[in-house]
Regions:
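Short, structured segments at the rim of ligand-binding sites
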Residues: 1-424
Length: 424
């Protein structure tokens, strides 16, 4: 699908509600499914990723009833016999969270996916499974695991995706003995680990840090049903936040001030760039201000990478984004994808491994004659949409349907901010 993104006649400005946090929703759905009894999860958006997790929960151990923006999840207290593979679509969270849970089912479980999902590395789990002589088979067609994980000590790198750590956090407390996770420094994305722990605690399962790199997971625990309201998503709010910082006149609602989301770092990053904004409760309002480049550490907030590359083009001076290696292993190689599309618009930037250097060049940006490529990546498409609006460029972007993965209503929600969308 081709989508043309243009500035609306009224220019930039308006109010937008942050969509529900996809990260928190994944976690709440799985905790509810593992509980015995009915949980009610409110403030949901049924993106492809969340729909994949809900579908997997229903296939494994729960009855799921969805409403307009909520879901009732009835944990059955036992695992269902599987008659088909578990389809994770393109959701890395769904797959990596469920692999350890699958070890509790007492049966072989095959996962399938689409896009680049089955190409994404799972070596952390593969090593753990092979150490315990469990079945772990991965190919481009799917991934099959079989056998029960045992309680005990687990050592894994702290600088790989926190999704592996969260997956073990979900499953190990249900085993009969205590377990410890020993994370080899540096520990990145700690905020996502603590988000998992906080959601688990709401459902009655607890863990604690023994020191900066060791987690204790007491065994013999049980998830309990509860009513859970999902926060607004800071990683998605980053798109209108960058637009507001550049152009002013944008208010974002639904952003909890006391959040555990690591992507709340977007506000600190924008403040360091010179952005002018005020917070009132869960709302943040931006005024236009001159922006300058800064040095950004992406270790705890990798999802911000693509839109921060757009921000760098629109700041004065140079922006350096460090510890961005994991961007190469997402739905696309996000560094290469954004470099290619931003250069097509006149952007000046380069990368070396996990370091991206972006040179402010707003005055030389232009709309290329050929369509830009969305690389089947929701964050690439939304970042290019911000560029179109903030730099007043009438861009054409393909693969725009990729937004269905995380924020299906993005274009409609962004319309009041001055982003006009037409099918091309």
């Amino acid at each position: 699908m081709l989508v043309t993104i243009r500035l609306a006649p009224g220019g930039i400005g308006g109010v937008i509600a942050a969509p529900p946090s996809k990260s928190m929703a994944h976690r709440a759905v799985l905790c509810a499914a593992l509980a015995v009894g009915r949980s009610h999860i409110t403030h949901l958006e049924f993106s492809k990723d969340i729909s994949a997790t809900l579908s997997a929960a229903a296939q494994l151990c729960a009855a799921v009833d969805t409403g307009a923006d909520d879901a009732a999840v009835q944990g059955l207290g036992h695992f269902l016999p599987l008659t088909a593979p578990v389809d994770c679509c393109e959701s890395g969270s769904t797959l990596r969270f469920l692999i350890p849970i699958a070890s509790l089912t007492g049966q072989p479980v095959t996962f399938t996916g689409r896009g680049r999902l089955m190409e994404r590395p799972q070596s952390v789990y593969e090593t753990l499974y092979r150490e315990q002589n469990l079945r772990f088979e991965q190919s481009s067609a799917g991934l099959t695991v079989e056998g029960a994980l045992t309680p005990g000590d687990y050592r894994l790198a702290g600088n790989v995706s926190s999704q592996f750590i969260s997956g073990l956090l979900f499953a190990l407390p249900l085993l009969p003995g205590d377990s410890q996770l020993h994370l080899i420094p540096p520990v990145e994305s700690r905020s996502y680990i603590d988000m998992t722990r906080a959601v688990q605690a709401a459902f009655g399962v607890h863990s604690r840090w023994l020191d900066a790199t060791t987690l204790l997971l007491p065994g013999g625990q049980q998830y309990h049903p509860c009513d859970y309201n999902v926060e607004g998503d800071y990683s998605q709010a980053a798109f209108p936040a960058v637009l507001g910082a550049v152009c002013g006149g944008v208010t974002i609602t639904g952003l909890a001030p006391d959040t555990l989301q690591g992507d709340a770092a977007i506000l600190d990053i924008l403040r360091r760039c010179g952005a002018a904004f005020t917070r009132k409760g869960d709302s943040v309002t931006f005024a236009k201000a001159p922006l300058h480049g800064v040095d950004i550490d992406l270790a705890d907030c990798p999802d911000l990478g693509p839109v921060l590359m757009v921000l760098g083009l629109l700041c004065e001076g140079t922006t350096v984004i460090r510890n961005a290696e994991r961007l190469r292993l997402k739905e696309s190689d996000r560094i290469a994808a954004m470099e290619a599309e931003l250069r097509a618009c006149g952007g000046v930037l380069e990368s070396d491994g996990g370091t991206i250097t972006v040179h402010g060049c707003a005055e030389r940006l232009h709309a290329p004659a050929a369509p830009l490529h969305g690389h089947n990546d929701h964050r690439v498409v939304m970042s290019l949409s911000v560029l179109a609006a903030a730099a007043a460029l009438p861009l054409t972007v393909d693969d725009a349907e990729a937004i269905q993965k995380s924020w299906p209503g993005f274009f409609a929600d962004a319309a009041p901010l001055g982003v006009e969308v037409e099918d091309a």
